Amino acid sequence: MLSENVKKISMVEKVGYASGDFACNLIYATVSTYLLFFYTDVFGLSAAAAGTMFLVVRIIDALADPFIGTIVDRTNSRFGRFRPYLLFGAFPFVILAILCFTTPDFSDMGKLIYAYITYVGLSLTYTTINVPYGALTSAMTRNNQEVVSITSVRMLFANLGGLVVAFFVPLLAAYLSDTSGNESLGWQLTMGILGMIGGCLLIFCFKSTKERVTLQKSEEKIKFTDIFEQFRVNRPLVVLSIFFIIIFGVNSISNSVGIYYVTYNLEREDLVKWYGLIGSLPALVILPFIPRLHQFLGKKKLLNYALLLNIIGLLALLFVPPSNVYLILVCRLIAAAGSLTAGGYMWALIPETIEYGEYRTGKRMGGLIYAIIGFFFKFGMALGGVVPGLVLDKFGYVANQAQTPAALMGILITTTIIPVFLLVLALIDINFYNLDEKKYKNMVRELENRDKVYLDHIDDFKA
């Protein structure tokens, strides 16, 4: 008879869990994609000031991750260890998102301070929700194939959220700006609508999921310094952390610079929504097949092929003239197919690193390990804010006017060369991942035996 820890999860619960990432993407993908543009072209910050702020905020947020992860792993409530954060974090997350897209009548310095305060607040609140949300997968099941399935549904919904953000947010912001006669108000109302939907979905996620995996008594002793032991003994975690930095760096750079590339290099501002849509569209086709691809190719081949596809699509953009819009969109589609495959599948590897950490140390640290991953991927996301801002400033970008050839070259380099360089590093890194299917199954069998011993003697442990 199968342990409850490894049984199949119902599709209702998978969808409920996935709705949490749809909610987060409605809000945070809007921030990642449009906040830099909002700050430079609507709010009134310089590209350099906005780019520097993105870096500073990401560093603060990333440094907070391990502390939040430790707190999460010490949580023991009637709602479970991870789920309470979805319930109680939803409201402040929505309010701070709206404040980020609000333009107060302050001086230039006052606006900069306001932007720092609201963006730091939003980022920390997002972390407080996202760390336990991600770790929740490891508490739902130990079945590796089910983890891949849950992650595939999650990434499908996340990318559906991305599609909404890419296609409808520009339309909605433009409509509300035109209707109100105020572009700043248009963006504020847009985020208000997205926030209300996202908040409700986070609560639905809380209601529809269940934590199953047994928590052993030793976990009561989890402390912040356990992070150093994990890096010493958990090689899959180290490799995956580096991989997350790179992939999030590439995706964040591409998202941030895409609106500049379409607006200025292609001179087709009307295509911004389509460029964004094509960047998310392959997810609808690819992600449902990730579990099958995982079974057929295995981890390394799947990720290697995905990264190579992304590289090919980006390099092709260098050779396509800006006037050939259709071919550019095809290149974008190819790059996105690779990016979405790698970016979707890598999340399924996090529960493996949690299991491996428990196997090596005897402590199950879902929150802390997910926070470690978060610490690194947020540095990757920081690249998406700081690199485009600093490169554009270096090449002489000036907002809301025709760009010089140097500025256009800076936009093109940021769109293609920089991401390709990072993807090559990702190819090298992921081939050091050493946890294959055979090792994983043996490890889970051992962990299940340990759980059985604990449950058989639970009264002795409590004594």
From Swiss-Prot:
The lineage of its organism: Bacteria, Bacillati, Bacillota, Bacilli, Bacillales. It comes from Bacillus subtilis (strain 168). This is Uncharacterized symporter YnaJ. Belongs to the sodium:galactoside symporter (TC 2.A.2) family. It is a multi-pass membrane protein. The chain crosses the membrane at residues 21-40, 50-72, 84-104, 112-132, 156-176, 186-206, 237-257, 271-291, 311-331, 334-354, 367-387, 408-428. It is found in: Cell membrane. GO terms for biological process: carbohydrate transport; sodium ion transport; transmembrane transport. GO terms for molecular function: symporter activity. Gene3D superfamilies: MFS general substrate transporter like domains (1.20.1250.20). InterPro entries: MFS_2, MFS_dom, MFS_trans_sf, Na/Gal_symport, Na/Gal_symport_CS. Keywords: Cell membrane, Membrane, Symport, Transmembrane, Transmembrane helix, Transport. One of its GO terms (cellular component) is plasma membrane. It holds the Pfam family MFS_2. PROSITE patterns: MFS (PS50850), NA_GALACTOSIDE_SYMP (PS00872).
